[in-house]
Amino acid sequence: MRAYEYRHVVGFEETNLIGNVYYANHVRWQGRCREMFLRDRAPAVIEALKHGLVMVTTRVSCEFMAELVAFDEVVLRMRLAELRQNRITMNFEYWRHTAAGEELVARGEQQVACMQREGEQVLPVPVPTQLREALREYATS
């Protein structure tokens, strides 16, 4: 099954006093992966965000299996787990990339809800067509 890939090199600013990556950065990278997916695969959604579309994160998780440190090269692989009504659930795998190969270091999940600003209110709306179509090729089932 195909995955959207986002590559990242860990910087010192992402590590803690001990020298490993601070856990919250894994969630930031999920968001960055999602943003790059929109840029690369669904640019019309970025335009819709300027006109009231809101993508609200409703759930996020990450399970850690190994530490990352500065200058580790990480490949995030994002797949569509579920798409229904106005909600999208994505699965993420974090792979440390080295000359010797790859090591799975974390897994995550994120759910977003598509909403539309209407004055003071934010109302649920269906997942935009371009996003729905772009995500299909990355579905897990």
Regions found by a protein language model. Give the residues of each.
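Hot-dog-fold acyl-thioester-processing enzymes
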Residues: M1-T57, M115-S141
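HotDog/MaoC-like acyl-thioester-processing domains
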Residues: Y6, F64, L68-A70, A81-S141
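Hydrophobic beta-strand-centered segment that forms part of the acyl-chain substrate-binding groove
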Residues: F37-I88
